[in-house]
């Protein structure tokens, strides 16, 4: 994939404007370090920084169709591009890139082709005959995208906020599953699945149908001409992804080029739950496993870079992004260009521990719908930007359109967590892969309790962040938090600390409005906090905030903030700085 920047309909076609667009495009170079391209057509500029995954030798982007009326700058992976090429048999393609089909589809079908694409994408095709264009983003928002408007009437599009925040009067997140058309200067939703209305589905649970749908989602993402690996924390989601990948890798074109031995990667503090579980799964599957350890101080030292790259002040996103950011640097240094990861399962199946308190199947289902619709501001943003900070791509099969349709049409009564019946979180997913004759995973891994990524890398990671923030944010500062930050006012010192850093990089009001807010417990939406009255006194995105559910739950709110006791255990000043790489 890539980093894209488009400036459309600007009033200044001068050389200075072209230089400025190039300068802004270079802010995205970490996303695509292998090729820089810029095409100007009148008052429109299309720029691209390319990370080559499919047909890397083709190079040149933005992409054109055969006689040049359509030009496209695109960040994406189109998994059904070979089938689409067959439908476009009257067209001549210049490259073997999967994204080459987009310009041709735009010429052939106009604005009505987006739903034909099976993949993840953000793109801007420009018709040079009349300077019309559309902008589109994938169904769930796996790829990041922003839209802004200049005082001169120009429309700006960028993969990251840093590409447009200094030059736009107003900007915002481009909504997932939508397209923007220059012909009516407005948005419309192209992604219209049945679950989007939040109506309660009634389809019976079919374990084999669910299993086969997910296997297809994983296998289609093995499309590659470059080395890749799998992120393996040892939790259910990443372990299933690794298991399926290792089973089917030998049958793919990727195995012919790079061998059938799968490389897996895990990160954590020394002795963390994820490192232990990840190694156990890797040994079971026979992967070439790489463990990356970091210290609390390593993570703290990276916080400013993480906030700059991930472009958020959301507490849970920063907690989870930091280990992923550190791991991505190491993975890229090994020559790997993309990884397959397990984001999205918890939203689809109600895997977060607070779902234990869902009062009925209706509220359970409505919460999963809310969580999926918000993914682009949380886990998708984290997975996309913390990896792309180092030119590494993350693919997420749980967010496959076809798989989501299967999973979200199951009667939610089957997803409800019922301990007295032995049904833990994500039970129907676990059961679908519980194969006695040809097991995908060891039983205790298949039924391991949910760990949020920021918890699984080591519980002292979050405790260390809180202790560090307490050194930099005083009680007096917290008293004035509402005056300093009236929007999404931070209610903890940790949140205040992140907000200060974010505002230094992105001081515009539009920037702070791109970050979600509201009360949360264990990553819930604000609505789900109402499920348990006790949660309102223990608001924290960590899974350990789900009192009475998590095996290592916080005993009470005061225990969370015992900074002095924590520093007796791990003196932050003495923590080593170097990242250790093992295996």
Swiss-Prot record:
Gene Ontology molecular function terms on file: asparagine synthase (glutamine-hydrolyzing) activity; ATP binding
Pfam family, one: Asn_synthase
UniProt-listed CDD domains: Asn_synthase_B_C, AsnB
Domain called Glutamine amidotransferase type-2: residue spans: 2-185
GO cellular component: cytosol
Tissue and organ distribution: Roots.
Active site: 2 (for gatase activity)
Induction, per UniProt: By darkness.
Record-marked site positions (Important for beta-aspartyl-AMP intermediate formation): 343
Gene Ontology BP term (one): L-asparagine biosynthetic process
Catalytic activity field: L-aspartate + L-glutamine + ATP + H2O = L-asparagine + L-glutamate + AMP + diphosphate + H(+)
NCBIfam families for this protein: asn_synth_AEB, PRK09431.1
Protein name stated in the entry: Asparagine synthetase, root [glutamine-hydrolyzing]
Biological source species: Pisum sativum
Taxonomic lineage from the root: Eukaryota, Viridiplantae, Streptophyta, Embryophyta, Tracheophyta
Gene name linked to the record: AS2
């Amino acid at each position: 994939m890539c980093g894209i920047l488009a400036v459309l309909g600007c009033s200044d076609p001068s050389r200075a404007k072209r230089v400025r667009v190039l300068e802004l495009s270079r802010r995205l170079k970490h996303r695509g370090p292998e090729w820089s391209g810029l095409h100007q057509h009148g008052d429109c500029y299309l720029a691209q920084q390319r990370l080559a995954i499919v047909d890397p030798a083709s190079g040149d982007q933005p992409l054109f169709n055969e006689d040049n009326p359509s030009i496209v700058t695109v960040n994406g992976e189109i998994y059904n591009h070979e089938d689409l090429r067959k439908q476009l048999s009257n067209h001549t393609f210049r490259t073997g890139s999967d994204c080459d089909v987009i310009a041709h589809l735009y010429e052939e079908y106009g604005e009505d082709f987006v739903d034909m694409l099976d993949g993840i994408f953000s793109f801007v095709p420009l018709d040079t005959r009349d300077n019309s264009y559309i902008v589109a983003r994938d169904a769930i928002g796996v790829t990041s995208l922003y839209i802004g408007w200049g005082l001169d009437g120009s429309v700006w599009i960028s993969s990251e906020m840093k590409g447009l925040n200094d030059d736009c009067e107003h900007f915002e997140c481009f909504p997932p599953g939508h397209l923007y058309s220059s012909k009516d200067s407005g948005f419309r939703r192209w992604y219209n699945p049945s679950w989007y209305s939040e109506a309660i589905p009634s389809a019976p649970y079919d374990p084999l149908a669910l299993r086969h749908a997910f296997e297809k989602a994983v296998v289609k993402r093995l499309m590659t001409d470059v080395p890749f690996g799998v992120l393996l924390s040892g939790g259910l989601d990443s372990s299933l992804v690794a298991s399926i990948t290792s089973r089917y890798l030998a049958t793919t074109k990727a195995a012919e080029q790079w061998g059938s031995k799968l490389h897996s990667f895990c990160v954590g503090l020394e002795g963390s739950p994820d490192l232990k579980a990840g190694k156990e799964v890797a040994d079971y599957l026979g992967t070439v496993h790489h463990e990356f350890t970091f210290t609390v101080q390593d993570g703290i030292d990276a916080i400013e870079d993480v906030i700059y790259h991930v472009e958020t002040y959301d507490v849970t996103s920063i907690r989870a992004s930091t280990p992923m950011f550190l791991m991505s640097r190491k993975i890229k240094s090994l020559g790997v260009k993309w990884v397959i990861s397990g984001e999205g399962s918890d939203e689809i199946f109600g895997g977060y521990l607070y779902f234990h308190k869902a009062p009925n199947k209706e509220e359970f289902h409505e919460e999963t719908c809310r969580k999926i619709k918000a993914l682009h501001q949380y886990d998708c943003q984290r997975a996309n930007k913390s990896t792309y900070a180092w030119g590494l791509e993350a693919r997420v099969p749980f967010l496959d359109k076809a798989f989501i349709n299967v999973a979200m049409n199951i009667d939610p009564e089957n997803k409800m967590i019922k301990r007295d019946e032995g049904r833990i979180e994500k039970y129907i997913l676990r059961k679908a892969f519980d194969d006695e004759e040809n097991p995908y995973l060891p039983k205790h891994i298949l039924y391991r309790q949910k760990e949020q990524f920021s918890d699984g890398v080591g519980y002292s990671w979050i405790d260390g962040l809180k202790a560090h923030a307490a050194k930099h944010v005083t009680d007096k500062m917290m008293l004035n938090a509402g005056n300093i930050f009236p929007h999404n006012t931070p209610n903890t010192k940790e949140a205040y600390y992140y907000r200060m850093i974010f505002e230094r990089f992105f001081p515009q009001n539009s920037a702070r409005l791109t970050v979600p807010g509201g009360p949360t417990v264990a990553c819930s939406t604000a609505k789900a906090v109402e499920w348990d009255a006790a949660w309102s006194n223990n608001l924290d995105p960590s899974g350990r905030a789900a009192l009475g559910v998590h095996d290592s739950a916080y005993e009470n709110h005061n225990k969370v903030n015992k900074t002095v006791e924590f520093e007796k255990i791990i003196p932050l000043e003495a923590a080593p700085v170097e990242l250790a790489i093992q295996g």
